[in-house]
Amino acid sequence: QLKKLEIKGSRACGITTLGEPIVINKDNEFYKVVNGQYVSLGDIYSVLEIDSIKAPIDFSEFRVFDKYIPVGVILGYLLGLNNVLKVLNVKYFKVENKEDVTKDHFTIKFKDGLYAFDKRNTVGSKVIAGLLEYEKTLKNLNLQDLNHKDTYYILFEEKKITSVYVKEIELTNELFVDPITESILKGMNEPTTFTGLLIRATEMLDDYGYPDSQDLTQMRIRGYERIAGFIYKELARSIKTFKNKNINGRSKVDLGPYDIWNAIIKDNSIKLVEDINPVQDLKERDVVTYVGEGGRDKGAIQKEARSFHDSDFGVISEATVDSSDVAVNAYMSANPNFVNLRGMVGKLENVNTPGVLSASANLAPFSVMDDGKRVNFVNIMNSHIVAAEGYEAPIVRTGYEYMVAKRNTDMFAFTAEDAGKVISVTNKGIIVEYNNGKRAGVELGRVYGRAEGSYYPHMIVTHLKANEVFKKDQVLAYNSNFFERDIYDPTAIVMKSVVYARVALMESNNTFEDSSAISKKFSNKLVAKTTKVKSVVIKFAQNIHNTVNVGQSIGANDKLMIIEDEITSSYGFDKKALEILQGLAQQAPSAEYNGIVENIEVYYHGELDDMSSSLRELALASDKRISFARKSSNKNIITGKVNDEYRVEGVPLGLDTAEIKIYITVDNSMSVGDKNIVANQMKSVVGEVMDYTIRTENGDEIDAIFGFRSIYARIVLSPILIGTSASLMKVIAKKAVSIFRS
């Protein structure tokens, strides 16, 4: 029935007292349908029997600080009224009195007469009608006076709009559209000037249609261009301050050296990088948020705004955080549906798993078989995974294991931007040259990532040699803690992040509340390395003795060095007296950990010549290591010399003072109280490390015990599917090897 009524864009909106349908067309004219015939009822004023001449006229406003100023006044001030009328094609004429005006016009009284303006030009009407807010003042002004800026100060005075607001209007006209916004507006075929946008915005008020507030097609996901936004905003602020103060022409544009930096660090969306694992590395670039500079207030984002919108499909994945920021912070899919580099969303045409699910879910076999709420926990668990020596490439794969390295930063993988060849390889770095002549490099060997206040040691390796050629997108170096060369394609790098175990699914005291038990053998397989950094601050004049060496194995009670205070030999003490005094004055910091000394760095504020000989020797050795690593990876060569901006635990390093950082790497096998992840997302706490052996009926050793109830209660099938598939693949592999050897 509606299809028959709603022809030529009209819409049904009610019925008469006789039950006759009423429709409204695109021109806001109402019709009743009588026996298939459309009978005009007029506009809304006619239907409601209201005098349209006396009815208020709609007009658009623009907010400047705390005041709302009609768009017509702003446009008139910036362009002149005649130009505004011409641009909007507004028809107007002079009349003797209001009675001569039809319902299609409204009037404004000026000093030189009464002028009628056409209401049927809806955009022009909304702009010009704003002048009615100043009708008392306009009676003393001629129409042509509004072509001059000075006249508008009289209008502004009526509404107590001071020069501060006027200058803001002028600056907004100059600075509102930045270069990035201009390019986007051009792509959208929209106006690229402030005045043009005011007119376009008024035009969009012509109807009541508007996109949903959560419609992603009406938004942009901005990346590092936000940094340019901070810079532009601070520059604009400085220019505004300059123009507001520049009364006598002697002021200067003043931008503080830390203004931009302070604006960035005050942004509430800022987060420290966590170099803990390659998936977390991806997540930090896939994360999107509604808060931050230019964003929304988290407290104002209610349930409706946190729901998943249809337009999110193909851009925003299932992954979000498990806190009060749920859906305020979310993660993009592994291949979001962007139409350009500015983060604009297009129409989704091809639906595939990488385009819908997050990187975490794409790495989780059978995750689509799990309860939807539990799939999100794959992403959550991936933020806390650390490297273990027993990791291997998964037997059951999704295929995304090959993509991770190509998306990672240099801490985890170094991928070729173009084809080229290797220039040099040392134990501390690799340098390559692309076909376009550009050189790049990455540090090899031990590097340290930071996450949540801890240091995590990573080992960057390469299989390439000097003068070897490579292809575009080939992984040139990778983190061996998380990646290995693929056995099928030696040029491909596959992610390794799993350890397969024979798990007995049973209920016992060890599986209460999702806990688990593991064998001693399996515990030793899961050895994780962490690095403890000992910081020692000393003065240049102090001597150091018996300093530990790089590569040395130390115990918790071993001394890292002996520091002698400045008791100076110029006092003429004999050798025995000096030894007594030195023994009283010396400091000897302890290691506090059992591990291996992997690196010693010295950062100093001052000149090497001012140091004691022992400290200078240590600093020179540190500088040599730092410089060699930088040179070997095509980086600018630096040393440990710093200034007073360098801080040790938040305190600036004083002049003629040095910080010695000793990196001690510790091995930690999985033990009671440690957390593990069963299958994709089943977090468990180790309740017992079994020093006895449990076997299956056919004699196979059990590596771990976990509760089947824990799996069943969470409606996840992936643990069962992964376990059975991996077991089957191992049997098939053994059969294949047996056939090959026979």
What role is predicted for each listed range?
Residues I7, A501, N510-F512, A517-S523, ...:
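Intein-associated homing endonuclease modules of the LAGLIDADG/DOD-type, together
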Residues R647-S742:
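Conserved phosphate-binding elements of NTP-dependent enzyme cores
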Residues Y165, K532-V537, V737, R741:
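A generic structural motif
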Residues T192-T195, I199-D322, V326-M670, D674-K675:
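Long, charge-dense accessory insertions within large macromolecular proteins
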Residues G9, L48, S52, D66, ...:
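Conserved NTP-handling cores and scaffolds of large molecular machines
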Residues Q1-V279, K283-R285, A330-P336, N340, ...:
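N-terminal non-catalytic structural scaffold regions of very large proteins
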